Design a protein with these regions (language model features):
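Hydrophobic aliphatic residue packing
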Residues: 6, 13-15, 103, 121, ...
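Solvent-exposed, acidic/flexible segments
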Residues: 3, 24, 47, 68-77, ...
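Short, solvent-exposed loop/beta-turn-alpha elements that line the ligand-binding surface or hinge
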Residues: 30-35, 55-85, 114-147
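Periplasmic binding protein-like
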Residues: 8-60, 95-96, 112
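Bilobed periplasmic-binding protein-like "clamshell/Venus-flytrap" ligand-binding domains
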Residues: 39-43, 86-124
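Bilobed "Venus flytrap"/periplasmic-binding protein-like clamshell domains
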Residues: 1-8
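Conserved C-terminal helix/tail region of periplasmic/extracytoplasmic solute-binding proteins
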Residues: 9-11, 17, 84-85, 91-94, ...
């Protein structure tokens, strides 16, 4: 359904997009080759820092070829590399916000579509349960006690 909604939204602004399905091996080969015009994929951050997204997707020409549709703005790539070295938290976050605005809003090189909701049922006897920050629902439970 997501594919059809994206296709309809693109058609509404005059872009004709087709939908093709591939087996995983072919899909990965196409991504690595740089011959795929666009794709929808899922991804979850490994650690809670904007560098995790920016560097993974836009840290080099090779990363953008494999993960981000051959985005070729070398100035952005240089800024991504430099941002990880900024030690002032406010300046670092401001740079990552500016990079996100450039990549997502100005260039539309990456379009986040949705986020997952994870629900947890906790009994009255459970103490100190803290879900993993990224929302994974398939994680190990440590340091949880019962009353």
């Amino acid at each position: 359904l997501v594919y059809q909604v994206v296709q309809q939204n693109l058609q509404a602004i005059g872009i004709n997009a087709g939908i093709k399905s591939y087996d995983e091996s072919s899909w990965l080969d196409l991504r690595k080759s740089g011959e795929m015009d666009s794709f929808i994929a899922t991804w979850t951050m490994d650690y809670n820092d904007p560098a995790n997204i920016m560097y993974t997707f836009f840290g080099s020409a090779a990363k953008t070829r494999i993960r981000s549709l051959n985005y070729s703005d070398t100035e952005v790539m240089a800024r991504v590399a430099a941002a990880s070295g900024i030690t002032d938290d406010a300046k670092r976050m401001a740079e990552y916000q500016a990079l996100e605005r450039k990549i997502v809003v100005d260039d539309a090189a990456w379009v986040p579509l949705l986020g997952s909701t994870h629900l947890f049922a906790i009994g009255d006897r459970v103490e100190s349960f803290i879900p993993y920050w990224a929302g994974f629902s398939n994680f190990y439970v440590n340091d949880v006690t019962l009353k």
